[in-house]
Amino acid sequence: STPAITLENPDIKYPLRLIDKEVVNHDTRRFRFALPSPEHILGLPVGQHIYLSARIDGNLVIRPYTPVSSDDDKGFVDLVIKVYFKDTHPKFPAGGKMSQYLESMKIGDTIEFRGPNGLLVYQGKGKFAIRPDKKSSPVIKTVKSVGMIAGGTGITPMLQVIRAIMKDPDDHTVCHLLFANQTEKDILLRPELEELRNEHSARFKLWYTVDRAPEAWDYSQGFVNEEMIRDHLPPPEEEPLVLMCGPPPMIQYACLPNLERVGHPKERCFAF
């Protein structure tokens, strides 16, 4: 029998209950929300995200998240969230509204989920359906390799796609991930990524760059640049799809111009 889908209608908000909260590190948490029954799945195609909405200080706040669980998981959905605490980022003294709200939630509290949302769906075996915009029908792109550039929390949609590819032994798509963070301790989901790399080294290539590198650091330092793209993403000759997710300035100033210099045409670049 097909499992019941939680997100039946993308226009309806579904309240889900917090059932577990795990401290991953100083500012990262894993939140587990119960689906309506133990037999339910979330119903989120690979490549799509959900929106959380909550009334915070009298205002409706809505933020996109990509779960780290999948439709293989019944009865729950997991989100890994970086909490932006107030008074820790000079530019954002108030911190992150939604992440601090999640941090303040108690077991048994509910929050509203809505989705699926997004312009890309991974259909398996190298096949991506991408809508140029909300009104268009999807264009199918089939590739042998995928380049991925993620910044900070932008890793979550990449992990979702990587996991979908790696879990199918008949999917021979090769993923090359370049993952940028401020410091080594900011690397979100590092254990999960390294486990995947160790299990699937032929199909999953992983490279980090950090703004501030520790003394003995085996990877790159600094912003994403042309050299990193040349060295750690598939070559343009393979006609890969290049996926990006991260802060808008990273995509606009670090990714797109350098991808173009290396020879990756805009038509094959997609930003989540």
Swiss-Prot record:
GO cellular component, one term: mitochondrion
Chief location: endoplasmic reticulum
Binding site for FAD: 63-65, 80, 82, 84, 97-99, 156
Catalytic activity: 2 Fe(III)-[cytochrome b5] + NADH = 2 Fe(II)-[cytochrome b5] + NAD(+) + H(+)
Record localization: Endoplasmic reticulum membrane; Mitochondrion outer membrane
Residues with N6-acetyllysine modification: 13, 21, 91
UniProt name for this protein: NADH-cytochrome b5 reductase 3
Species per Swiss-Prot/TrEMBL record: Sus scrofa
Source taxonomy: Eukaryota, Metazoa, Chordata, Craniata, Vertebrata
Gene: CYB5R3
